[in-house]
Design a protein with these regions (language model features):
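Phosphate-binding site recognition
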Residues: 1-456, 471-473
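Structural signature of nuclease core domains in nucleic-acid processing machines
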Residues: 435-560
Length: 560
């Protein structure tokens, strides 16, 4: 493998270019945006980790009149457009602000973070304090914004003020770049101060409305919050979402780019596994890979050439959206989730104009959220051949990485929900050797589960072990016993008793009883109970057979 300087965690365009980091050329975005005549405000929504912040940093580097970045764009696609570069490269006053760090458990702490962001933004423009084109009243407000002592009114008006002052300073209208505009309201919705933060963000976005100092604005986020909620009164406003085609090649890696990356890194043999794990997003007319994942995996391959693909989304707080969805919808969406986890598609109505406070108001809103945040994607035509009604989309899980996240979440959800339900009748049936009631109680639990492995052995083993986890028992799964492996062993040392479970699964209902008998026979033949005879007063053995969401239990008392 060839060593490349992989910029994982670096979203600053200038840092990447100056330090010689590997860069996939997305400069065509500049020409695409400038080619949209008559558009004052462009909102671009994509899932997290698809290069939005890096793209915005590139725009700032290209337009900002305070910079001289011609060298950084040499050999990039945009440099071929000489007249455009003459007119626009480092010729326009530019404001770039990102709200992705604005978070807090309550409104006051989040508001403090926001005022810090505004303060740091104004520190980039200290020249305004010395300018004879800025009056003393405005200079005083600028000082207060820098110090973090400005009133709420002036904080809300800070972007409007900055564009006006820069217009006065340079005599040119200002380009305004706002990154991750929806993070503050998303965090606010999660922590119970949505209305307060929405009011602040509405104020900040007044810079987009009837602003003579504005040349144009580009805004990025995850969701297209309903215009009437946050962009009230904004004219000449267009949005570009994952259902559109115009800009989709600029966010995420298309196949030709991934092919070139793998060639440059000399890891073409990893193409199939990278496609399986990190491809599969169908945005507009483009199939794209998640760039965050591809770059992380390439970096890992440089450390360990034998490294297998893993989920790089797995340990992020954003994944809570799946859990909240399952918690809300519960058994109502079990069948749909099982279809998705089996590699199938489901058809749902999708609304791109959501507001965070209404995300949980309907099942459709939650499916829309999973789609817009990248946990589901639009199925390709070859993956779904049915006819779709207006406003509906055929959805599927994009790749192995996201499937693993769903599976992990489903397991945790089942474990948690099982712990909350009353299992005393089931436990009594186990220790009383009541296979009839045990069959009944297990069937009830099975109907509440979400299958994530096409009803194969590992699904049933996890189900069986999960029933007893967190209930005060010791649980062993697939431990070596006698001449083989029993599936699950449950220990109750306080009462000196142990229950041994051997599970079988069958593909037909009529074999349920015979497989149950086979499980009992296996316990006998392989002497699973023998090692417990000296240490426990009561040993109960159970054979269980499963068919989809049905089961049968039979018992064998070894020692009572």
């Amino acid at each position: 493998m060839k060593l490349l300087s992989i910029p994982v965690g670096v979203s600053d365009f200038e840092e990447i270019r100056r330090n010689g980091y590997y860069y996939v050329d997305k400069s065509g975005l500049i020409g695409e945006l400038l080619g949209t005549t008559g558009t004052k405000v462009t909102l671009i929504t994509r899932p997290r980790r698809f290069g939005k912040t890096l793209g915005m940093s590139m725009l700032e580097s290209f337009f900002d009149i305070q910079k001289d970045n011609k060298a950084l764009f040499e050999e990039l696609e945009i440099a071929k457009r000489h007249e455009l570069c003459m007119e626009w490269m480092n010729q326009w006053p530019t404001v770039f602000v990102s709200f992705r760090q604005v978070d807090g458990l309550n409104f006051n702490s989040a508001y403090d973070m926001l005022t810090l962001v505004i303060s740091e933004l104004y520190k980039k423009h200290l020249y305004l304090l010395d300018s004879d084109k800025v009056d003393s009243f405005d200079k005083e407000i600028v000082k207060q914004l820098i110090q973090g002592t400005a009133s709420a009114k002036d904080t809300k008006g800070s972007l409007m003020l900055l564009t006006r002052l820069m217009y006065q300073q340079y005599g040119k209208p200002v380009i305004l770049l706002i990154d991750e505009y929806d993070v503050p309201v998303a965090k606010a919705n999660s922590n119970g101060y949505y209305e307060e933060m929405l009011d602040v963000m509405k104020g900040l976005m007044q810079a987009l409305k009837d602003n003579q100092a504005l040349c144009f604005a580009v805004i990025t986020g995850c969701l297209k919050i309903a215009k009437e909620s946050i962009f009230t009164g904004t004219n000449n406003f267009i949005s570009d979402t994952i259902t559109d085609s115009r800009l989709n090649e600029y966010f995420g890696f298309v196949q030709s780019e991934v092919d070139q990356i793998l060639k440059d890194a000399d890891v073409l043999d990893k193409a199939e596994s990278i496609r399986e794990w990190y491809d599969g997003y169908h945005f507009g007319d483009f199939d794209v890979y998640c760039p965050w994942d591809v770059m992380n995996y390439l970096l890992e391959l440089q450390r360990n050439p034998k490294a297998k693909p893993v989920s790089y989304w797995k340990n992020t707080s954003d994944n809570a959206v799946i859990r909240s969805f399952i918690d809300y919808a519960g058994s109502n969406i079990t069948g749909k989730l099982e279809t998705l986890l089996a590699g199938g598609t489901i058809v749902q109505r999708v609304d791109e104009n959501l507001t965070y406070d209404y995300l949980h108001s309907s099942e459709n809103n939650l499916w829309s959220m999973l789609y817009l945040t990248g946990y589901l994607t639009k199925a390709r035509e070859e993956d779904y051949n049915g006819k779709l009604a207006d406003g509906t989309v055929a959805l599927m899980i994009p790749n192995a990485e996201i499937k693993e996240i769903f599976e992990t979440t489903v397991i945790k959800w089942f474990d948690d929900s099982t712990k909350k339900c009353d299992r005393s009748t089931l436990f009594d049936a186990v220790w009383n050797g009541d296979s009839g009631n045990l069959t009944k109680e297990m069937n009830v639990l099975l109907r509440r589960t979400i299958s994530y492995h096409d009803y194969k052995e590992d699904f049933y083993h996890a189900f069986l072990a999960g029933i007893f986890t967190g209930a005060g028992y010791m649980v062993d799964s697939n431990k070596e016993h006698g001449e083989g492996r029993s599936d699950v062993v449950v220990y109750d040392p306080i009462n000196s008793r142990v229950a041994i479970f051997e599970a079988k699964y069958t593909k037909s209902l009529d074999k349920l009883e015979s497989e149950c008998d086979a499980a009992i026979q296996q316990i006998d033949d392989r002497m699973y109970a023998k090692e417990y005879e000296d240490d426990y007063d009561q040993i109960l053995c159970y054979g269980i057979s499963f068919f989809k969401k049905r089961c049968m239990v039979k018992k064998k008392l070894v020692k009572t």
